[in-house]
Amino acid sequence: MKLRLRHHETRETLKLELADADTLHDLRRRINPTVPSSVHLSLNRKDELITPSPEDTLRSLGLISGDLIYFSLEAGESSNWKLRDSETVASQSESNQTSVHDSIGFAEVDVVPDQAKSNPNTSVEDPEGDISGMEGPEPMDVEQLDMELAAAGSKRLSEPFFLKNILLEKSGDTSELTTLALSVHAVMLESGFVLLNHGSDKFNFSKELLTVSLRYTLPELIKSKDTNTIESVSVKFQNLGPVVVVYGTVGGSSGRVHMNLDKRRFVPVIDLVMDTSTSDEEGSSSIYREVFMFWRMVKDRLVIPLLIGICDKAGLEPPPCLMRLPTELKLKILELLPGVSIGNMACVCTEMRYLASDNDLWKQKCLEEVNNFVVTEAGDSVNWKARFATFWRQKQLAAASDTFWRQNQLGRRNISTGRSGIRFPRIIGDPPFTWFNGDRMHGSIGIHPGQSARGLGRRTWGQLFTPRCNLGGLN
C-alpha cells in the first residue's frame, strides 16, 4: 500500500510504501524511529488520526493506496535523516533545483523534468544508511505527486477499472459493437449476474454477438446442471448504424425492456479508459463522468429492471430499490413531490396507487399549489384528489388558451373575412413612374385592408390601397 505523506508546515510531500498489515504505530515509527509518539497524523490537517486499538491496521481505518496523510512533529523533534551539508544545498538552489525535505529523509529532486534528464549525477544520498533495516521513502516533486494523487484517486473508482479488466480479459475484436456489448456485460457482472451456458474460453463475443441471446442468472439460482430449468434473463444486441439497441427479457415472458446506446458518445470514452497512459494523465473528470453516465444508464434502464424481474419470478429478495423502503419513508417521499409527480407515481404499481390515494396528502398539495385557495369545507367528505385534478385541468386549459391566442392573434389572417387580426397599414415602396397617368408619387404608400383607391386616375391597385397614410379621415 502506497501512501502520500505531506508535512503540515512545509507542505513538502513524498511517497511511502507500507504493508497492508502495518498499523498506525508502524507508520509513526517509519517517520521517527526514536520517538514515534512525537508524530501526529491527520487526514484533514485538523483532527488527529487515532485508532481504538493499537493492533488496528491502516486498512481497518479506511486507508487505501493513494491516500494523502498530513504529519507534524512535536517541537524539538526531528527525524534521523540529514542533508549532506549546507554548501551542497546552496549550490543546488543556485542551479534552480529545489530541495524537498521531509521528516523521514532529505533528498534533492529537480522541479523541472528536463533538468533531471540533463543532470544524471543528481542522486539521493543517505549518509547514515538504512535505519533499522528500513528503506527510506521515495521523494517526489509536489506538482508531480498531486498529478499522481489525482490518478490514484481515479483508480479507486471501481466501475471504470472493473470495466477495463473485463475488456482486457476478453480483448480481441475491437469493433464498436463488441466494445459496447462487453461494457454492458461488465455492468451485468458487477450487478450480480453470471453468464449462463457460455464459458469464457468458448464464447466469442465478436462472432456470436448478433446471432444469440446472452443468458444471465444469479449464483443462488444455480442448483442443477440442467440450465433449461434455471430462471434466467436474456440480453440481445441489435446494430443499427450509429446506435446499438439492447433488449432484455426475463425468462420466457413477453414483456421486455430496451435501451439505445450511441456509439459516437460512449465508444471513444471507453477506448480512453482502455488506454492506461491516457487515463492516468487525464484521470479526470470528463472521461470518468461519461463512463459513470454510461454505467448508470445501463444499470437503471436495463440491469435493475431485469434484476427485479428475476428476483420476483424466483421468489428472491428484491435488490435495493424504492419499493423496499418502509411505508413511512415512501409517504415522506411522496409529500416532497409536486401533485403531478404523485399522479405519475400512482401509475407504477398497486402499492404506490394505494399510498398516493391518501386524502390528507392531496389536501396538502391543494394548499401548496392552488393560488388563493381557501378551505371552506371540513371533514373527510371532500375528495381533495378530485379537487386537485379539477384545478390542474383548469390550469392546463388556461395555459393552452393563452398559447392559442398568442399564436392566432398576432398577424394571422381570418379565413372568413380575409383580414388580418391587427389593423395597421403595411408599408410598401414607391410605385413605378408609369402608374397614375405619368404622375409619380413620392413617398411610401400605406395599404389598409378593405379600403378602395380614390383620386388615383380611377385605377384600382389590387382592390386594397390608399395613397400615403390614413390618419383617421373618411373613406
Swiss-Prot record:
Main site of residence?
Answer: nucleus
List the keywords (alphabetical).
Nucleus, Ubl conjugation pathway
GO annotation, cellular component aspect: nucleus
Residue ranges constituting the F-box domain according to the UniProt record = 319-365
**In its keyword annotation, does this UniProt entry include Nucleus?**
yes
Q: In which pathway does it act?
A: Protein modification; protein ubiquitination
Q: Where in the cell is it found?
A: Nucleus
Q: Which GO terms describe its biological process?
A: protein ubiquitination
Q: Where is this region: Disordered?
A: 114-133
* Assembly, per entry: Part of a SCF (ASK-cullin-F-box) protein ligase complex. Interacts with SKP1A/ASK1 and SPK1B/ASK2.
Protein role:
Component of SCF(ASK-cullin-F-box) E3 ubiquitin ligase complexes, which may mediate the ubiquitination and subsequent proteasomal degradation of target proteins.
Give the comment on domains.
The F-box is necessary for the interaction with ASK proteins.
PANTHER family, alphabetically?
F-BOX PROTEIN SKIP22
Task: Name the chain's protein.
Answer: F-box protein SKIP22
Species lineage, top-down?
A: Eukaryota, Viridiplantae, Streptophyta, Embryophyta, Tracheophyta
The primary gene name is: SKIP22
